[in-house]
Structures are given as C-alpha cells and as structure tokens.
C-alpha cells in the first residue's frame, strides 16, 4: 500500500511552520484551542486522543490519522485497542471508512518502530 505516515506527518509539520510564520495570530488561536480540547478534563488526555483517532477515520483524513496514531501510541493505547475503537467509525461511516482503518494499521506499523 502506498501510504507514508512518517512522510505525511513531516510534510504537515513543515507546512504548519509556514502557516505559523504567515498568519501567527490565527495559528496561535488554533494551537490554543487544540491544547484546550485535548487537555484532560472529565475525559483523560489519553481518551481524547483515541476519540481523535476515531474522528480522523470517520472524517477520512489521511493527514490526521498518523498524528492521532502517534499520540495514541505515546499515550499507551495498544494496536488492538486502537483498531477496535476504529471499528466504531466503520459502523458510522460504512465500508468506505474501512479503507481508512487500513491506514491506521499502516501508521501503527511504521510509527511503532
């Protein structure tokens, strides 16, 4: 399968630096909102990253998936737990979403190394 989670994440990070330099106030507002949403509250930060992974799959976002997988791995989620959670996205989005679950599996393979 032609999918490069590490390359996708690297390119995303490079482009985000350009966006930060071009529109710093808007970029900072986005980062603050992201930090607020992903910080622990009633739900743990770990749980929120799993929810973000499932949301990324449901949204069919190939750029979001490796970033969410990396955060999930760093938070201690197992491959089995992540894939099981992603099946909820398939329940909501149907078989076309299953193709994005394969991107999760690929990202887990590459980012676990």
Cite the ranges covered by each PLM segment.
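Acidic, glycine/proline-rich low-complexity segments that act as flexible tails and inter-domain linkers
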Residues: 1-47, 99-113
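Alpha-helix N-capping/helix-start residues
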Residues: 45, 79-80
